């Protein structure tokens, strides 16, 4: 536990933090990088089985989908919003000098969407995005594979490392997903979800267990066919 022993020390801390808060992009990068470093030192798993994806893996997946300033990007199991942050960093690295004011406005908010069932993770992800210049993202408490999520053909990019922990309640699963793969396994349901949420021509990069590629059950075969 870290204690602030005197009012004088507290004043110095506040003054130091105020000096960090500037609109300069490089300083915002520093704050975001520091926040991500601190996240890496926290417990690795959330209450629902989420694990933080290592940054080099996230960056590789973002490179594969090559997001553009006009994309709509979603992570339906966002955790700490690592994939969304990596996407933002990719866009700044490749398009910062050529983006229009309208594209910067899109970048600051509606471009990025994340869902999660862990309220603590949602608070962490919102702060993570704000520290990377994304001031108004759509971060919602939502069970992505349930009936409460009816989003269809909305996004151009999906990135995710969905939970592989067990199964979900069959009665809560969205009927559209069960029509694609009749299962309670989360890894298969999320793949069906990506197919539904993406626009025609959309791109997706997702981490899955080996069983998704080689499983012989009817559910595995049906999702691979789609």
Predicted regions and their residues:
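Short, conserved SAM-binding segment of the class I
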Residues: 189-193
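Short glycine-dipeptide loop
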Residues: 198-204
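Amphipathic, well-packed alpha-helical segments that form the structural scaffold of globular domains
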Residues: 15-18, 35-43, 62, 66, ...
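Conserved S-adenosyl-L-methionine
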Residues: 50-160, 165-169, 176, 184, ...
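Long recognition/docking surfaces used for binding and targeting
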Residues: 1-42, 50
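Conserved BB-loop
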Residues: 213-214
């Amino acid at each position: 536990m870290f204690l602030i022993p005197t009012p004088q020390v507290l004043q110095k801390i506040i003054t130091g933090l105020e000096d960090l808060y500037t609109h300069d992009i490089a300083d915002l990068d520093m704050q975001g990088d520091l926040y991500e470093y601190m996240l890496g030192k926290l417990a690795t798993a959330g209450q629902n089985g989420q694990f933080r994806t290592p940054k080099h893996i996230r960056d590789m997946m973002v490179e594969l989908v090559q997001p553009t300033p006009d994309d709509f990007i979603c992570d339906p199991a966002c955790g700490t919003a690592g994939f969304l942050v990596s996407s933002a960093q990719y866009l700044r690295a490749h398009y910062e000098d050529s983006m229009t004011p309208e594209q910067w406005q899109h970048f600051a908010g509606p471009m990025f969407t994340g869902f999660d069932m862990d309220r603590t993770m949602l608070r962490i992800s919102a702060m993570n995005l704000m520290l990377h210049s994304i001031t108004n993202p759509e971060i919602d408490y939502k069970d992505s594979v349930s009936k409460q999520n009816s989003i269809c053909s909305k996004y151009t990019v999906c990135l995710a490392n969905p939970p592989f922990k067990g199964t979900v309640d069959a009665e809560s699963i969205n009927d559209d997903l069960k029509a694609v793969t009749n299962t309670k396994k989360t890894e298969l349901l999320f793949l069906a979800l990506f197919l539904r949420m993406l626009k025609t021509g959309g791109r997706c990069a997702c981490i899955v267990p080996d069983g998704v590629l080689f499983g012989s059950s009817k559910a595995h075969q049906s999702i691979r066919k789609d």
